[in-house]
Amino acid sequence: MSSPTTPVPVISWTADEAIKFLKEWNFSLGIIVLFITIILQFGYTSRSMFVYVVKMVILWFMWPLTIILTIFNCVYALNNVYLGFSIVFTIVAIIMWVVYFVNSIRLFIRTGSWWSFNPETNNLMCIDMKGRMYVRPIIEDYHTLTATIIRGHLYIQGIKLGTGYSLSDLPAYVTVAKVTHLCTYKRGFLDRIGDTSGFAVYVKSKVGNYRLPSTHKGSGMDTALLRNNI
């Protein structure tokens, strides 16, 4: 004779319990929300690279956290309707997570930079300064890029890259790497402001399916020698 089935307990909150929880955790939740808000508000490469990296870490952990929560909802679904939606959300989250990794790996093959795994954008700006390749993420697909030298400090699109440079060190070409292609920007204008400052404007001139040169030797002109089709 089979034993009687034990009913599954239903967990529910009363209004008083919810208010008590908020009172007990209100301070901690407020600090966490404030921290995330500050990171999202001021996390830009042109403001603070450290804050931007923290922002990227938070965004990076959002997808696995979302997948965990959707799987939890599937296991502990309240009814069949919730179960159906939870399964759909889980599949969508996993597919988007896999697509992110595939695109990031393809971009890494093209550039060789760990910025390829940036969850915010798939646009990586690449500039060769005296044999050193700088790679930084940019949010938008710009038609022009501006490189600025201020008393030896190099900025491009407002992002500080390095020091000890002059206008003569600026390359003839700058590239922006994407998942499917590489955009080449040609220097169209250069103006000197004082003895140690000035700026150059680069205009998008060519788009192709290339990767960055594997060697960083030589001048910035080497960036134009796009090879190794992928």
From Swiss-Prot:
It comes from the Viruses. Residues 1-24, 77-84 are virion surface. Its main location: virion. InterPro entries: M_CoV (IPR002574), M_HCoV-like (IPR044362). It is a multi-pass membrane protein. The keyword Membrane applies. Coiled coil: none annotated. Keywords: Glycoprotein, Host Golgi apparatus, Host membrane, Host-virus interaction, Membrane, Transmembrane, Transmembrane helix, Viral envelope protein, Viral immunoevasion, Viral matrix protein, Virion. HAMAP family: BETA_CORONA_M (MF_04202). This is Membrane protein.
